[in-house]
């Protein structure tokens, strides 16, 4: 059979087996017919009570224990390595496994704490996972390309292979984090699903009939299974927010320049019209905030020429808290509600989530106002993406396929940049103009809108990224938070006779209440450019309210049950 395989298929198969071989034999599991939902009690069945206690804790709770010495970094690291190994065997979410190196780092952290009485940093002993765009010493960065296996970004015999480390990795190590795995991505990174020829398709842990999202889909799936308490992805069109939404997690798309991108691999590197940004994903809003603040404390602008000199701004956080606590309706926060983007209406579960959030906000005395809503990515006609696929001769993945297109020249790129700037100005004027609609006399403080037209999507049916990509064009801050799960008993919304577009009708026709049942639904909380402190603080408040209104467990310090 192997003799019938092409060279790229053999290379992919060997890499896939190498990933499995990196899992200790004692952590291998037999794969019977799996249930649809492999979260919660199912994956817990492979763990000890102590491992469950550790891995169900969020990043804030873990660092409270590790920095004080109540939990050893080794014990915490081993627990998450075990759970991550199981997670990969259930949903195909890992590209690189370096558990032994992680446990050695954890031992050194324990020795440091014992010798000095002080933690190495605020992330001391915290396991952190990474999307397979970040270079880590000793392991590959394939980004899903078979042609990148055993190379440095497709370059054979490059001395940087398995030696170079991304700036984010260096800073995480300085903060005391324990890096232990890298997670799956779709080839090209330009997809709302995650699939490649190395590990196959990354499934949604809550519903294995559905996608984990993309392009940080491996991060979403792993963290949803509590195989990691928090990690980092990247976002150029929704690639942090979509997996966060599809997996019931928290995900932040900060404005460009807040997180250090130096030394990370990327598709279409050098394309500056819309910048890819790094953002954290976590099981709690507290964990998200912890990671974001910790990286800023390292002053990344000293090491990355594109990072902005903006530390965490306590004054903005405190001012936002003051607005939240205002008793006067005339001074309180106000919100824009974007029900659809003018092209595609969301499917029923997402509509329910939007209506629910508006009900909560109005019930709390906040004003809500309706909010309304290219040729940016393929400036090289897809040439960069196709060239990396061509390195091995591998076939294209249907969800990530790229067709050769027009190669834009410098004049045309400049014209697109002018269009982008004009769009940004129009939207800025529109946002500022909402001051006429609010009782505060201020523009709306934030906008709530869908992350996608659907809950976690049926494979092959991610058809519309409009709810996320416009935010990248604006370079606005966006934070995804979980609201609930799809309910199949919403008959009043399953009939429509009028549609915004042919695509709208097609996406509505994709809806299947039985298949989507139980799928996580998240929404976006959007702020203007560089408003991360404000949006994170508002999200903390909103999560408390969602918990109160739904009776869910504490969304501030742990997400919905996984």
Features from the language model and the residues they span:
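Glycine/threonine-rich flexible loop motifs
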Residues: 140-159, 347-348, 456-462
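Short glycine/serine-rich loop segments
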Residues: 162, 166, 170-295, 474-482, ...
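A short helix-breaking turn/cap at a secondary-structure junction
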Residues: 42, 253-355, 391-395, 548-562
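Residue-level signal for inorganic ion chemistry
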Residues: 80, 102, 288, 335, ...
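Glycine-rich, small-residue loops and helix-cap segments
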Residues: 69, 125, 174, 178-180, ...
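Conserved small-residue hinge/capping positions at short loops/turns
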Residues: 112-144, 165, 178-185, 361
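Short helix-loop capping/hinge segments that flank enzyme active sites or metal/cofactor-binding pockets
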Residues: 41-50, 124-151, 209, 327-338, ...
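An N-terminal boundary/leader segment
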Residues: 1-111, 363-366, 548-562
